[in-house]
Each structure stands twice: as C-alpha cells, then as structure tokens.
C-alpha cells in the first residue's frame, strides 16, 4: 500500500511540474493536495464460515454460493460511523477460489472516524479488525465476532489515498483543456482533463478526451460522439 501512495505522490509531482509551464495547464494540487479528503479504504473478506454465510442469506434473501446475483448492488450500513458498505458479486470471482468460499468487498468513506465495534479509525485497523466491524454491522452476536474475525475470515485491506480525487472541489481552469490554446503536439487525456458537458468517473470520459486529442492534433475530420443529454431527457429523469 505504501507503494501505491508513492506512485500517486510521484504522479502529482510530475503533474505539478507540467502545470508550472503555463497557466492553461491546470492546477493539479486541487486534486492531489488533500489526501485526508480524497481517500477511502476497502477490504476483501474471504470466508466459508456457515454462521457468516447464514447472516448474509438473511440480509440478501439469496444464497451467495449459487453463482447467481447476491446483493444486487451495494449494501450500506447507514448507522455505521465509518459509513461502511459491502457487496458480493457472483461467486466465484477468482480462478483459484474454492467452491465453498465467498468473497465480500467492504469499504468505508470515513476512514478517520472511530468504529462502532472497533473503537479505532478504519485507516488504523488490521484486516481482522475491519472484519470484526463488518460482522458487527451484519448482526453477528457480539460474543462471537472476535473469534470469527480471527479464525474464519481472510481479509486484505487496501487504502486508496486518491480514489475520490476526481470529485474534489474545483473551479474553471483547474482541469486543463484537452488541447490547450496554442498546443500543436501536446494534449491532456483522461479524468483530469476538461471536456464539455461530460461527467468524470466513466470510461467514456477518458475515451472522449483521447478522441478529442487525436482528432484535434492530427486534423482528423471526424466528430467526437455527443454526450448523452440525460439531464434533459424525460426518459432518464423518470
């Protein structure tokens, strides 16, 4: 995880060095300058314990071992101090996963707040402690939580320091245009470049910026697909 943080920091330094060259190259510090606001943490819990599986069945009304839809989306624990959520996709997810194993994805938006069962912030917790907090919120009896978390789950936590950097507060000009004025062999691609009307956090956004860059720099006479006007489309609004 330290390696992930270092990579993010190095990218931010690189982007800042580029931005120094011209005001039209944006302000990357708006997106990578406050890790306390842009981070959240997730964990993968693997278990085959029948007590835990039974609690999952009660919540989802489905058997997670059938290979069919399980949670059908994200399950949010709205009374969680961490704002903890979890989901189970169709099992098995991995080639080497055993047939009786279930993989649960758990994440939290508030990593700096003490938990309800584990009185520590998520960012300071081990995988076992994160599991204990999750078991508490799915209704496992309190006197069974620690033993189940320690001996019947294998949990891998992952801290993502820049996961919501896309959504940090910004102003016009903080994201550079795909092809800044005057550029003939240089363009910005991806989620931190500015393209009209579209919304970041989608693959389409990144693809659209790449198309704009290639068509614009190479003089390709081809239109970039329009952004779907869902905000004004009654079919979507309904």
Task: Describe the residue ranges of each PLM region.
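Single conserved hydrophobic/aromatic residue that forms the stacking wall/gate
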Residues: 1-8, 12-15
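Conserved flavin/dinucleotide-binding core of flavoenzymes
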Residues: 21-238
């Amino acid at each position: 995880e330290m390696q992930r943080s270092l990579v993010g920091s190095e990218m931010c330094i690189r982007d800042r060095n580029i931005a120094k060259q011209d005001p039209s190259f944006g302000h990357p510090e708006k997106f990578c300058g406050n890790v306390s606001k842009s981070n959240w943490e997730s964990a993968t819990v693997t278990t085959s314990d029948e007590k835990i599986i039974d609690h999952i069945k009660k919540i989802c009304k489905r058997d997670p071992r059938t290979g069919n839809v399980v949670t059908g989306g994200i399950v949010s624990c709205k009374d969680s101090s961490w704002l903890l959520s979890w989901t189970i996709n169709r099992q098995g997810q991995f080639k080497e996963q055993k047939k009786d194993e279930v993989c649960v994805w758990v994440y939290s938006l508030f990593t700096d707040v003490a938990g309800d069962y584990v009185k520590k912030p998520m960012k300071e917790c081990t995988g076992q402690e994160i599991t204990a907090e999750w078991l508490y919120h799915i209704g496992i009896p309190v006197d069974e939580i620690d033993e189940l978390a320690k001996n019947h789950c294998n949990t891998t936590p992952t801290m993502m320091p820049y996961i919501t950097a896309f959504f940090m507060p910004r102003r016009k000009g903080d994201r550079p245009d795909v092809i800044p004025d005057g550029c003939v062999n240089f363009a910005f691609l991806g989620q931190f470049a500015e393209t009209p009307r579209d919304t970041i956090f989608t693959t389409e956004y990144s693809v659209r910026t790449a198309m704009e860059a290639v068509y614009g720099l190479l003089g390709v006479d081809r239109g970039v697909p329009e952004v779907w006007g869902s905000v004004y489309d009654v079919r979507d609004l309904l």
